[in-house]
Structure formats: C-alpha cells, structure tokens
Amino acid sequence: MSLRVLEPGPLTLVQDRGRPGLADLGVGPSGAFDQRALHAANRLVGNPEGCAVLEAVGGGLAVVATAPHVVAVTGAVGPVSVDGRPVASGRVLSLRRGDVLRLGAPTVGMRWTVGVGGGFVPEPVLGSRSFDTMAALGPAPLSPGDELVVGPPHGAVSLESVPAYLAAADVGVGVVLGPRDDWFTPAAITTLLSCPWRVDPVSDRIGVRLEGPLLERARLGELESEPVVRGSIQVTSSGRPVVLGPDHPVTGGYPVIGVVVDTDALAQVRPGDLVRFHRRRP
C-alpha cells in the first residue's frame, strides 16, 4: 500500500519525533517542527503518536492513493480537497484507490501535516524517518513520482476530529531567560520582552530569524561554542535574534539570551508574522 506523489509542493518532508539524545555524536534532533500536529494527525488515524507523517510547507502537495487509506491533515489551516471536493482538515478522511488528496496554500499557519493509517515507513536512519535539512540525513524530500510506502494499520480509528489551535498572525510565546542573558544589557532584555519581532523570509527549519531592534551586548568578545537546544534564542554578532528550530546544529558560538518554551507555535509562523516573547520563570 502506498501514496504516490503527483506534486510535492515547495518542500515536503517525512518527519516523526526525530533523533533525540544523539548530540554527543554530532547529530541534531530534527523531527516534526509542529509536534502537536504530528500527534493529532496520528491520533486521528489510529497510529501511535510517533509514527512518520508528511510535513508540507505552503500549498501544492498532491498525492494519489494506490489503495484505500485513512488519512488526516492537521497543522496549518486552508483549502484541502479530495478529487476536487473540498474537505475539512483536522478530521478523518477516507481515500479510495485513485483518489487525489491536494493541499492548497494555507490561510493560517505555514506547515501542513499529513498522517496516514499505518504511518509512512521509509528506511529509518539512526532510529528515525525524519529528514534533517541541515545534515541531509534521512529520507530525501519528496519528488514527483515517489511511492510513499505505508505500514499496516495499527488499530481502529477512535476520533473523528481534533480542534484547531492556530490563531492570528501575532504569536505570543513564553521564554526562559539564559543561559547567556548576562551577555546583554538590561535594555536589551527589556527590548526582547517588550517589542514585537517580525519573521524574516529566510527562516526555515534550522532557525526562525527575527527582524526588529538590535539587542545590545554588555560583554564583547567571542563565546566558545557550547551545546544548544531547539528553541534557543541566539543573538548574532549583528544583534539579531534567531530562534533555533528542529534542524539546528548541536553547538553554537552565539550567546543564547533565552530559550522558547512553546516551540511548536513557531512552526506555523509565516514571513511577516509578528512574534512576542513573554517571560517564564524556570
């Protein structure tokens, strides 16, 4: 059983929970950018939450079913169709052999997640089926004609739908300051937590780059490379913040002013959206 790719869209990847715990080998975590969407799609189709799904940026993905399949589309909000008929996202969808599932351009959010009963089962690499865009590790991005093999169903479908959780294009996320907030002036900390930050168009799975006031350092010089995690807010030498995504390097030399708590929310920001940081206590 499989789904065949007719059109891959701008970028569609296979993703699961990723490769946590391999930083000592120089391997980043990768995995689905929007973990909530991963879990929701898998719950809808009766899979364990960590089964591999498709993560599609923007619109344009089209796949045809080569056999009957149960699928679910979560994450972004926008037009979804089966054989040209509009259908709802966040719900269980039944595909017959020959049916074409097509995703339009999102009206809210950035990344679609497509789950299928049984999960997608390309050959895992280091325990995961995720593609790491920085390391080029894992199953390659989708291309026209690819056959996406699907595993056997895990169990009966128990949910019909899940509630949407995306809001307007002004995202508030919690941030815990540190570990290098002492490298910045008090004014820079105030600026980080009080100003809206605009998402730069060059943002990707490696990092969400933000435009806004420059953050002034209290300490000059270079920081020795040290471990970083997803959600780390690195401040570049120019004073611009970058929030690291799932495909981040395992170490970095820019000081980390804080760490974002809700990293899933940043999976769905679009170029030009505003991000606001709110302080959380450890």
What is each residue range found by the language model?
Residues 1-282:
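Conserved "landmark" site that anchors the functional core of diverse proteins
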